[in-house]
Each structure stands twice: as C-alpha cells, then as structure tokens.
C-alpha cells in the first residue's frame, strides 16, 4: 500500500487536481492511493450537491452512503445524502453545527470498520479564520508502531479495544470494535478515533499494550510526516479514504454574514478511474 510510505511534508501532497483536465479522475485516484487523499479544484460554478455528484460519478463511487447513526427516527434530520456543515446555534449536532474544533475521528460511529471508504468535503465558503481540515495518516503510524512494539500493535487489532458512543442528545447507541483491521483484500483499515465518543478497554490485547499504543499514536498525531492541515478554498473539494485516514477540524471564527460552509458526502466505495 503506497500510503504507508507517504510523507505529508512533501508539498506535492496538497497540489490540487484541476477537475477540468481530461485525466482528472486518474490523477485523483493516483493521489488518493499515494497519500490517502486528493485536493480537487472544481472550476465550474453550480450547486454544491451537483458538483459533488459530478466528482463522485467521475470516481465511480456510486450513491452517497447514509451512516447507521442517521437511520434512526430521532436522527432523520441528518440523513440527507449531502450534509451541510456550518454553525447553527439551534442545531444539536455536536460536530456539524459548531465552530469548535473536532478531534481525530473517522466518519461512521456505528458502522463496521472499513464500511465507509470515502469522504468528500466540498467548500462553499471558507471560515474567516481557522477551520482547516486536519488529516492524520494513522495507517502509516500504525505500521511504524508494528515494527517497534508488536504487542502494542496487537492490542489495537483487538475487537474489544474501542467503544464509540453517540453524543447526539437523546440517542443512546454505541459500537465496539478494533482500531485497526485487515479487510478482505488484505489491506489495513482503521477507525482510529480519540475524542469524546471513545471508551477504551485497556484489558484488550497483551497487558499494557493498548496504553502504549495510544501513547504512540497520540505522539504521532503531532509528527509532520503523518499530520497535515488543509484549508479548502471555495470551489475546492477534498476526497479522502475514511477507512485509511483519521481526520479532524481546527476551531474557527465566522463573519456574521459569511459563515463557513462545507458540504459532506460519504461513500461505501473507494475511488476508481474509468477503464
């Protein structure tokens, strides 16, 4: 897997692909395979949903995926295929509607590890200050850990290691599973999350392994080889492998008449170029 050798200090990581190029889909797929993500300039103006749909069609992603958490009656307001992410004081969603930062997570709190393979974020309007999307190459960090401390890495593979619970008011649901796993193709996948949704079972795996593993990963999130801040400009999209990267958000400030506005779509397929 190329992403295991990625170095986020390389400025080519954030070199955007022009979606108008005839070979843009191949460029995007190549960047995603190499780095886990691709930045895309969507030059043509139009409704955000239409721009994301054009991008997802070019990448053969299929229809947007609705996460399991949003299939409950109490969460139906968040079940749209395209989710608006902007500050809204009357909204109770702990991530979409606040200007606060978001700590490392993967999308799909209740979904099986590797189920949601792709996230697209499209920028309608950038924040006045802050609001960068943070990316963490958790797979590469895990590969380094596995070389240095096999017992710690084994603890992260335990099916009891990580429980994630909903923090949406009134929705008492949770899911337990490994932090890393190997999919049917033999590739590493992740659900590394380290935020207020998490409960860790330190008895999982070899004694002391999970604590050492978390110490290692938390240190790795500050390593510039693995950590990157991406500030999207209006009309840009970020395509990333939700099953191979963890992500977060810097806190931000809005102007009263110009709120930061991103639109998100999730997919169960990985990007593929046309034959």
From Swiss-Prot:
Kindly list the cofactors needed.
Answer: Fe(2+)
Protein name, entry field: Uridine-5'-phosphate dioxygenase
Regulation of activity is described as: Enhanced by ascorbic acid and inhibited by Zn(2+).
Q: Which organism is it from?
A: Amycolatopsis sp
Task: Give one GO molecular function term.
Answer: dioxygenase activity
Q: What happens when the gene is disrupted?
A: Inactivation of the gene abolishes A-102395 production.
Q: Does the keyword Iron apply?
A: yes
Going by the UniProt record, its keywords in alphabetical order are: Antibiotic biosynthesis, Dioxygenase, Iron, Metal-binding, Oxidoreductase
Which example biological process does GO assign this protein?
Answer: antibiotic biosynthetic process
